[in-house]
């Protein structure tokens, strides 16, 4: 395997991984669990300091196994019963008794959450105290990327700046990567080297089934399924994509106790990169090798596009994740590389105005809408229709990606600020 392809695999394995619960509150749960481990006993007080974007994405989403929303319950349960060795699955084995104990801490005013001014989009600092010690853990740049630990105000760990970058914001820095090189890697790599990505199907389809079998959030997936059964809607590949992606997000945002295979720190974006591709593969009876190659396009393509702008912003990441999924769907349908590029152009043209106003139950509607856009855009591309030189869409897919990055990075910070202030008021 050439060295560049090895870098691609490292990227995928670095930011496509299982996550239980929305990753922003889970970040606080993880930091609190590590702080408690440092204390050696359960804390009496917990102070949580987070960036505005982490705050925004934690306000309205359920924390798994708690039946509650927000950073306070996430941090408290992480401290009381979280497993610091489990990363994004820190709350996988939380019990009802531990949730009750965590809630008592909150009810007694012992858990305080504050916004902190920082240039980092993903930032969480937790200070946990007992009668003897205080422990401080700082996460910055990635949901589990600890950059510093302090015990009794003494620094006991600082991240070595010479180590390879592992944050979502920097994951593609210095890597020779383009849509064309991703396509070549996906279609030419040895199957044994990429088959690990198939776990995404197992996890995210299981999450979709959970969302269809049980009432979570707005029940977007279940509602569409019921209306097909009533005859109001027709069953089709398009409806299957909408139902399964929405149902998975329903469960994800509703606090289901199943992990999602995340993408770039987001479970919903992992769903968007996975389920439409699975449904397209099922339609064409694609084998595991073909599906794995399509997953490389959707997951690595999404990571590459999103590396052009901050990991948390006023822009809904499902919009461009679905563009990469559309690329993969064209491949599964037997389309050309040029048609795959057209699918990306078409999807971004359709979804580029979708804002992020926090993680919550309505994400299921956005995930479903983005997935349907991926399908629509793939069909247009397969019929040689491509949006070009219109609005932010350039005459070349790489230029379009740069335009989107510019729009979000320089054009949307004020929008993000206003969204957060509206939500906090």
Curated annotation (Swiss-Prot):
Pfam families recorded: SDH_alpha (PF03313)
GO biological process, one term: L-cysteine catabolic process to pyruvate
Superkingdom of the source species: Bacteria
Transmembrane segments: none
Gene Ontology molecular function, alphabetical: L-cysteine desulfhydrase activity
Record-stated family: Belongs to the UPF0597 family.
UniProt-recorded name of the protein: UPF0597 protein VF_0641
